[in-house]
């Protein structure tokens, strides 16, 4: 079994969630969860989120539990979406790391998470105070 903590466009009902189930006859298991020690940000346009380590903050998301077969099909697609190359991990938009998360049923487990990489650090950002992409403030209006 492999776990993935999603906090943005990969969460159920969001634009990229279908990637979690491509190429598999069965669906992974989904549970609401929290990751401590992270802050959630949106790029300036508000089109995508990213997480960074930040003591004292937490983010809400979904813990997705895959079978080994499901993960072998899903993770290359997810790495491509997130601009993560395991052969060159510091070169993309995101880094894939293991992080301790807690489900709403109080189960604690390690899960893969995509954290902001060095390329994202160069973009203007906005803190999502709620720590929940689904409850974020509206994007700023551009004139």
Predicted regions and their residues:
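Glycine-aromatic micro-motifs
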Residues: 1-143
């Amino acid at each position: 079994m492999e776990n993935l903590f999603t906090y943005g466009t990969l969460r159920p009902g969001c634009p990229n969630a279908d990637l979690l189930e491509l190429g598999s006859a069965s669906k992974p298991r989904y549970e609401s969860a929290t990751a401590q020690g992270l802050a959630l940000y949106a790029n300036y346009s508000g089109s995508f989120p990213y997480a960074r380590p930040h003591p004292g903050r937490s983010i809400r998301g979904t813990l997705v539990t895959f079978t080994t077969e499901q993960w072998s099909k899903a993770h290359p697609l997810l790495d491509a979406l997130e601009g993560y190359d395991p052969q060159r991990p510091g070169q993309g938009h995101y880094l894939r790391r293991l992080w301790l998360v807690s489900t709403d049923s109080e189960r604690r487990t390690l899960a893969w998470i995509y954290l902001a990489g060095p390329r994202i650090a160069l973009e203007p950002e906005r803190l999502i105070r709620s720590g929940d992409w689904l409850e974020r403030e509206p994007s700023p209006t551009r004139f």
